[in-house]
A protein has these predicted regions:
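Non-catalytic helical/linker scaffolds that mediate oligomerization, partner binding
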Residues: 1-475
Length: 475
């Protein structure tokens, strides 16, 4: 059993039922819907295909709606792409003008108020660098420091500038409402700056009458500075190394990755490492050695999941990429699991009742040589608390809620299943015997550690731990 999870971005390369079944069988756990591209109709069709493929394979698949976020972009160029050369002057304006080699509009009307003389402006993921010479009304006059080709709708980054854009654009709000109605299991918020950004997402969710976990994409320097508050406020984190490396020193990104992973584990929050993990496999059938090391090190650092972007959405080898990533992940896990139960920060102890029960369950399973950890969970929190200790035993999560089952596809080592509601601990134990026998995971007589809440079915009441020897019931 592979413990770490694989998130795959969907796109034209996998837009058939057969391809999605193959992706799931290859190891996809979470399907990412990138709302920077595609129409709502296209996303709905993909969603329906994912649910059908999940049902056919009998495997839980989480659906992640990734919102575009308030990305600042250029407008359009009248005659196609233009090439800027070092020393050229170039104007970015909030006026509606046809773009050319000397001027182009921007989608962000607040730009002139957010920059000043000497500020750095980056275009196209930092490939083109400009420096602000002056601001005259709606026009920002710049000089080209590093030239290159720019074209319609390329992104603009403003390192160090306090950009006054809302956490959610109008498009994001529309996309979020659609994704919630569609049935997504989790949402990712782009360009998070601080903990307050999650409030805007929750406000829309409450209006729609449906809350799902919100993932903070850490890709702004402000989010790095506020990482402890961001991790505490959000339900999970994505280390979005692409945009982060544009505005934040490239050489410091690996350390940010390690710090975020450690912080998320300490807080029992799932963490995804993303961007260029298997980039060469967009066009090649094998990854580079550096990519293999990157994936393995993310797992050794403690990531819950690794993510594929263009590799799976538009790449030539999407299924092969997932299979290869899965092999690399498994090899890294062998090293990780050989070290035994993973403590959190030395001296760090759980602060909650549920956290204490989870730690005790992992330690007892370790001491007794238990075969598995069984978590009855309504919200998924019990399973996530068990997950952070990276126990050698698989974690089987039983829940009555299909949404919780799908959300747990993001958590390390957790295999989640929907089961009927039980009202007593005796019924709970009987259910364990029946379900484990049905799954064929363990043998009669094997020791498992059960964690649950009493009374059953009430979120946040984890207070029970039981050592159980599986019976032959149901086999």
């Amino acid at each position: 059993m592979r413990r770490s999870k694989i998130v795959c971005t969907l796109g034209p390369a996998v837009d058939t039922h057969e391809m999605l079944v193959a992706m799931i069988e290859a190891g996809m756990n979470v399907a990412r819907f990138n709302f920077s591209h595609g129409t709502h109709a296209e996303h709905q069709a993909r969603y329906d295909r994912v649910r059908a493929a999940s049902k056919e394979t009998g495997r839980a698949i989480g659906v992640l709606a990734d919102l575009q976020g308030p990305k600042i972009r250029l407008e359009t160029f009248a005659e196609g792409p233009v090439e800027l050369e070092r020393g050229d002057e170039f104007v970015i304006t909030t006026e509606d003008v046809p773009g050319d080699k000397s001027i182009c509009g921007t989608t962000y009307k607040g730009l002139p108020g957010d920059v000043s003389r000497g500020d750095q402006v980056l275009i196209n993921d930092g490939n083109v660098e400009l420096k602000v010479l002056d601001v005259e009304g709606p026009r920002v006059k710049t000089i080209v420091i590093e030239g290159g080709v720019i074209s319609d709708h390329k992104g603009i980054n403003l390192p160090g500038a306090a950009v006054n854009v809302p956490a959610l654009s109008e498009k994001d709000v529309e996309d979020l409402r659609f994704a919630l109605r569609m049935g997504c299991d989790m949402v990712a918020l782009s360009f998070v700056r601080d903990a307050k950004d999650v409030q805007d997402v929750h406000r829309v969710m409450d209006e729609e009458g449906r809350r799902v976990p919100v993932i903070a994409k850490v890709e702004k320097p402000q989010a790095v500075q506020n990482m402890e508050d961001v991790v505490a406020a959000f339900d999970a984190v994505m280390v979005a190394r692409g945009d982060l490396a544009v505005e934040y020193p490239l050489e410091k990104v690996p350390m940010v990755q390690k710090r975020l992973i450690e912080l998320c584990r300490r807080n029992a929050k799932p963490v995804i490492v993303a961007t260029q993990m298997m980039e060469s496999m967009i066009t090649n059938s094998r990854p580079t050695r550096a990519e293999a090391s990157d994936v393995a090190n993310a797992i050794l650092d403690g990531a819950d999941a690794v993510m594929l972007s263009a590799e799976s959405s538009v790449g030539a080898y999407p299924v092969e990429t997932v299979k290869t990533m899965s092999k690399i992940v498994k090899a890294a896990e062998e090293e990780l699991l050989s070290k035994g139960l993973q403590p959190l920060v030395p001296g760090k102890k759980p602060r909650t009742q549920g956290g204490s029960v989870a730690r005790a369950a992992c330690e007892i399973a370790d001491f007794l040589g238990g075969r598995g950890l069984i978590a009855f969970t309504q919200s998924g929190d019990t399973a996530r608390r068990l997950s952070r200790y990276r126990a050698t035993q698989p974690i089987i999560a039983f829940t009555t809620d299909e949404g919780t089952r799908n959300q747990l596809t993001l958590s390390w080592g957790v295999e989640s299943h929907v089961v009927p509601f039980v009202s007593t601990t005796d019924e709970m134990v009987d259910l364990v015997d029946q379900e484990v026998a049905r799954l064929g995971r363990f043998d009669a007589g094997d020791t498992v550690i059960i964690t649950a809440g009493s009374p059953p079915g009430v979120p946040g009441t984890t207070n029970m731990l039981r050592v159980h020897h599986l019976s032959a019931q149901g086999s």
